[in-house]
Curated annotation (Swiss-Prot):
Residues 29-69 form a coiled coil. The keyword Transport does not apply. Residues 1-22, 84-105, 218-243 are annotated as: Disordered. It comes from Mus musculus. This is Retrotransposon Gag-like protein 6. Widely expressed. Belongs to the LDOC1 family. RTL6 is one of at least 11 genes called Mar or Mart related to long terminal repeat retrotransposons. They do not correspond to functional retrotransposons, but rather to neofunctionalized retrotransposons genes. Keywords: Coiled coil.
């Protein structure tokens, strides 16, 4: 009896089916990888947009805080009494001495010293209007414009330590807008002081040498007073002049 050869006849038919299934699996994996890559790019774009929106929100909140400060302080700083406060006989009630508002500071280093002087004078005459550090900082910021105002915006945020620290705010303002002319003058003063010290040191050495020559009897050398730093020390006497 001849056995049927079913296994050999089915084998060629099953090979194309397996190959088709493998192709489907490969296509599915490729599609998943492409989808995953697209989702990652979209997520990265969304994160960048979120960071940008967060920065914009922080900037808007800081500007809003600054605008609120500007709106609150000038209204409270009324230098002269209103018309309704004038009495019937035309006299004004006793008030604090009139003081003009400090000129706005836009970031010019050459104007910083004058601006801070005006601020100090104003706050001295209107001390009752600044009960705390926050009010002093807020008023100073209200007189900033241009580049200086942009610099102050981050320091007016709620988490800024300088918002309630007037002296710290002044120190940071001076560090940011320090005058180059003032620093050049300080450098010149330090250079002149060092030169004066060198002149005085040479004068002390000259006097010591004169004493040693006089004690040894090798020659006389008058002891002059120490130089004050403005004129050079007298030259040592030369023994070869009489030769």
């Amino acid at each position: 009896m001849v056995q049927p050869r079913t296994s050999k006849t089915e084998s060629p038919a099953s090979a194309p089916g397996a190959s088709a299934q493998m192709d489907d699996v490969v296509d599915t994996l490729t599609s998943l990888r492409l989808t995953n890559s697209a989702l990652r790019r979209e997520a990265s774009t969304l994160r960048a947009e979120k960071a940008n929106l967060t920065n914009m929100l922080e900037s808007v909140m800081a500007e809003l805080t600054l605008l609120r400060t500007r709106a609150r302080i000038p209204g409270a700083l009324q230098i002269t009494p209103p018309i309704s406060a004038i009495t019937s006989n035309g006299t004004r009630p006793m008030t604090t001495p009139p003081t003009s508002l400090p000129e706005p500071f836009s970031g010019d280093p050459g104007q910083l010293a004058g601006f801070l002087m005006q601020m100090d004078r104003f706050m001295i005459f209107q001390a009752s209007r600044f009960p705390g550090e926050a009010e002093r900082v807020a008023f100073l910021v209200s007189r900033l414009t241009g580049e200086a105002e942009k610099w102050a915006i981050p320091h007016m945020q709620p988490d800024s330590p300088l918002r309630n620290n007037y002296q710290g705010f002044l120190a940071e303002l001076r560090r940011t807008y320090k005058s180059p002319l003032r620093h050049s003058r300080r450098a010149q003063i330090r250079k002149t002081s060092a030169s004066n010290r060198a002149v005085r040191e040479r004068e002390r050495e000259r006097q010591m040498l004169c004493r040693q020559l006089a004690a040894a009897g090798t020659g006389s050398c008058p002891v002059h007073p120490a130089s004050n730093g403005t004129n050079p020390a007298p030259a040592l006497p030369s023994r070869g002049r009489n030769l």
